[in-house]
UniProtKB/Swiss-Prot annotation:
EC number of the protein: 2.7.7.8
A Pfam cross-reference name: RNase_PH
Gene label: pnp
Protein name per its UniProtKB record: Polyribonucleotide nucleotidyltransferase
Cited InterPro entries: ExoRNase_PH_dom1, ExoRNase_PH_dom2, ExoRNase_PH_dom2_sf, KH_dom, KH_dom_type_1, KH_dom_type_1_sf, NA-bd_OB-fold, PNPase
GO cellular component, one term: cytosol
Subcellular location: Cytoplasm
GO molecular function: 3'-5'-RNA exonuclease activity; magnesium ion binding; polyribonucleotide nucleotidyltransferase activity; RNA binding
Amino acid sequence: MFDTHTVEIEWAGRPLKLETGKIARQADGAVLATYGETVVLATVVSAKAPKAGQDFFPLTVNYQEKTYAAGKIPGGYFKREGRPSEKETLVSRLIDRPIRPLFPEGYKNDTQVVVTVIQHDLENDPDVLSMVATSAALTLSGVPFMGPVGGARVGYINGEYVLNPHLDEMDESSLDLVVAGTYDAVLMVESEAKELNEDVMLGAVMFGHKGFQPVLDAIIKLAEVAAKEPRDFQPADYSALESEMLGLAEGELRNAYKITQKADRYAAVDAVKAKVKAHFLPEEGEAKYTAEEVGAIFKHLQAKIVRWNILDTKSRIDGRNLETVRPIVSEVGLLPRTHGSALFTRGETQAIVVATLGTGEDEQYVDSLTGMYKERFLLHYNFPPYSVGETGRMGSPGRREIGHGKLAWRAIRPMLPTPEQFPYTLRVVSEITESNGSSSMATVCGTSLALMDAGVPLAKPVAGIAMGLILEGDRFAVLSDILGDEDHLGDMDFKVAGTADGITSLQMDIKITGITEEIMKVALGQAQGGRVHILGEMSKAITESRGQLGEFAPRIEVMNIPVDKIREVIGSGGKVIREIVEKTGAKINIEDDGTVKIASSSGKEIEAARKWIHSIVAEPEIGQVYEGTVVKTADFGAFVNFFGARDGLVHISQLASERVAKTQDVVKEGDKVWVKLLGFDERGKVRLSMKVVDQATGQEIPNEKKKEEAAE
């Protein structure tokens, strides 16, 4: 019934198995991939023909994690998986980026990749395995795909590169880098690092590229026995159209791309485009080409002319040379009632970034396959349509916004203080108000400024820069701080963020083969110079974190209590801690290890809560004077509540220095009194005295103290 084919190899000390022919047989391509004991199913379906009028390649990648894979049941009312999590969105992008350039130009059939995690061994992250499974499924599917693609994770532990480290090993690694590519080219890099230099980062990329070569061999081996017949796809030949269009519009397009202002340049390009359309799509008579074909070739021609201009003149669209960064203006504190704020402007790209400090109860709970954990640093990136002068959809963030936010998050996180150094939850929101290239790197710079403005003790300021690379034969040009127009014209787009001393995040997308290690080294070196320049410009606004928090930020005091006292502080059903919060106004968060965080914008509220908690967990000291409240009177004395919830007896003989006939003659219920702890009787009951304390001042009376000592 099943025509099953399997290939198995040893990869980084664990078995990797690729199987096809048994599951999801109606998909164009389906591969069940197992690494260790983590299992994913990757499927590919591509329509047999493009939709009419389709002018782009509609590729969709959906990565989904099923909770049953880790033996769990989803939370929530419906008890089933809902909208994609942040990780599912990020891994979908991770799979998409290296495969998209390998579909032939002109292929516009609707194509969907679905990757499902169906088993997780809690040791091997399914993201790299999903990339491998997708590549294998595409290679087998018969869909035109110039693969296969391999992928690997690289760690850097104790000065050594580690291929596909286990999840628990990543805690010790100063690098988390995922690389993907073909036999002879690196296509994609995504990473977070702890201030590593350019040589170490490039070495990790090449180490990972070498490390996934056996995976490519395994995919080819499987394809030799299980691949479907390749679909007959021949891209249309538009060389005649391109040649004619070049003759018609080259001069005007070259002039248009000499205009440095974005709006004016766009207007000039639109005028050339209108002329081209009028020529090739006449209102009268039959047109030789469709509007989609003319539009696509015009776009292709734009890219060619910009590339030629840059390689020939070493001058950019906006008049800069290859290495110049656009003018930068940095401002902090522009929103004084927020906890920290910054406005970062680089050319026509601008971000308002606001930092907010919160308490432990503001941490985000993340329910992943590996277990529930709390995230104390949140970074949200918003890209409204007005930032590029357009109208568009508003609402929940799209994949691009989530991906850009995570890139900035990775860049900043290595420089954050530990929870012990700074016990706050941090949320940063980046509002992109203008965009003409590299808004994600503007977010990195703005986040660094806003956090320093908020008084968050960053280890060092962080900046980011977006780079491009154009390669034609043996000529190449590396572009620093690319514009939006330059973003899609290059052969390599990469974003580098870090401090003056090293890289904290690197994202790279390479679209062609032929980019050597040496070219990448030159590009990273140029990026380092640009990053240092940007840090210098940022330092004009603020050089280090402010010594104190903003006026409106909450204050947090940390204290530690014995673990066995946590129950007493919380109380039955949370009764005690609720009372403390209600009476003092402070927010209180108690960790399982006995760490207590007390937060409020008022120092008095924090101190009141601290004293209350201290009175619950500490033991009263014999000989000390405490303030208390009379809670009950009796013939033989008064019961006084002191030191938190403790009660003790002031015997009638200890109420006053003179003889007392009736307790109520001295105190009544509700009276505030000062008492001294004399000790404990044979049954452990608390013995208190009022007569040895001056009830007006709370100070001990010297003569009474001597009498008491003599009596003892």
